[in-house]
Amino acid sequence: MAESEKEAALPPKEEFSDWYNELLWMAEIMDVRYPVKGLYVWYPFGFAIRRSTYNIIREILDNSGHQETLFPLLIPENEFMKEAEHIKGFENEVYWVTHGGKDSLDIPLALRPTSETAIYPMYKMWVRSHADFPIKLYQIVNTFRYETKHTRPLIRLREITSFKEAHTVHATWEDAEAQVKEAVELYTEIYRRLAVPVLRSRRPDWDKFPGADYTDAIDAMMPDGRTLQIGTVHHLGDNFAKTFDIKYEAPDGEQRYAHQTCYGISERSIAATISIHGDDKGLVLPPEIAPVQVVIIPIIFKKGAEEVLAACRDVQERLKKTGVKVEIDASDLRPGAKYYRWEMKGVPLRLEIGPRDLENNVAVSVRRDTGEKEQIPLPEIETGVLQKFEAIQNSLYEKAKVGLESRIFDCTELEEVKEKIQKGVATIPWCGKKECGLAMEDRIGAGILGIPLTPRGKGKEKCPVCGAETETRVYVARTY
């Protein structure tokens, strides 16, 4: 490896924080040098990953009856302050616009931290009858929160550049509950497409979304054993409907308050994907979101160079016709330097074609995730590449799933939990009482994620705080 390449080597992934920060700029995901804390710039390569990721999100939502929309960024203070419990959760994080030019505004305007108070005044005007339901809208927007904690690109931001928020309206509490369940499944499907296995749980009441009846959440296990919240789904009951006077005419002619849900997902989805799959060489991307899915490396010698380049161009055109995003690296860099470059960018599949390969009418494929080499006959290159993509996708998911499950530890004592959460997620019996939950968090030094949506109970057990019998276990973890 050349000296310049040594200088550009990533820290090992086991040094996760340094690895993550270096990878973001070495793979050209984000530039962190913007002169405002917590605001970052997408490189074109990173933005292409973002675009493909959000295309998946749009596809899954659109196919389940959601419609995309767009609401304003600015929220009048009088609307923003209507929902007291909701505002209590955000009041210290709001950016306020107080002037237009040199003139003071009569009503200050909030930069949305989230859009309930922007959308629900419009729902009051739009909702008329039970026949209007369900309303299932979503938007993908930037949101702003004055984070005072340590910011980290894609994970903790002052400007969330890619916030997908859905807001639904229903006739009954039960209809809204069914929508929550659907949303959890949709998010699970989104992450399955990203080859990211998830933990699904119901947050404890003290950690639910401000103003919600309850919150279900999706978490990913990061390489350092901490969990990252990568999706939330909130049952709002009729709380916001009462605040914003969202009523409908029921079949019996009575006016009733609507019931609502909201659910969000952000660029943390990308943070989880690159963190879980990446390795010491750089990104390892699922084929569906890779800006370059195949890179063709011509193996050039003086003799037969034109024939090799012509064959590479032919393969490129054939793959493009099947929808594959493919590049040829015919630069003057030596092959090892080319491999380094494209491995850093996580290109799922490398094809090498040289004079000997042409004689045998094959291309040599090299998988980014495993390094496995295999010949693909050139007449079958299209089907061969697509089969490799499917194998890579399945392999990434299964590897991540095994990794997640191997780091979930069922515990019975709080001291054991303190030890195990240094490696991953612990489960522990809990009676359900708030005072016991808070005492547990205090003694463990970590938070209760929530009650698994797929129960992990082992029959009757005892709460480690009060000794009461319970069949419920909760996830406990260190979190981002």
Swiss-Prot record:
GO biological process: prolyl-tRNA aminoacylation
Catalytic activity, EC: 6.1.1.15
CDD domains with a match to the protein in the record: ProRS_anticodon_zinc, ProRS_core_arch_euk
Enzyme class: ligase
GO CC list: cytoplasm
Subcellular location: Cytoplasm
GO molecular function, one term: ATP binding
Gene3D superfamilies: Anticodon-binding domain, Bira Bifunctional Protein, Domain 2, C-terminal domain of ProRS
InterPro entries: aa-tRNA-synt_IIb, aa-tRNA-synth_II, aa-tRNA-synth_II/BPL/LPL, Anticodon-bd, Anticodon-bd_dom_sf, Pro-tRNA-ligase_IIa, Pro-tRNA-ligase_IIa_arc-type, Pro-tRNA_ligase_II_C
Catalytic activity: tRNA(Pro) + L-proline + ATP = L-prolyl-tRNA(Pro) + AMP + diphosphate
Keywords annotated in UniProt: Aminoacyl-tRNA synthetase, ATP-binding, Cytoplasm, Ligase, Nucleotide-binding, Protein biosynthesis
Keyword ATP-binding included in the entry's annotation: yes
Entries under Pfam families matching the protein: HGTP_anticodon, ProRS-C_1, tRNA-synt_2b
Cross-referenced SUPFAM superfamilies: C-terminal domain of ProRS (SSF64586), Class II aaRS ABD-related (SSF52954), Class II aaRS and biotin synthetases (SSF55681)
Matches recorded under NCBIfam families: proS_fam_I
Similarity comment text for this entry: Belongs to the class-II aminoacyl-tRNA synthetase family. ProS type 3 subfamily.
Job description of the protein: Catalyzes the attachment of proline to tRNA(Pro) in a two-step reaction: proline is first activated by ATP to form Pro-AMP and then transferred to the acceptor end of tRNA(Pro).
Quaternary structure (record): Homodimer.
Domain observations: Consists of three domains: the N-terminal catalytic domain, the anticodon-binding domain and the C-terminal extension.
Record-given protein name: Proline--tRNA ligase
Native source species: Methanosarcina acetivorans (strain ATCC 35395 / DSM 2834 / JCM 12185 / C2A)
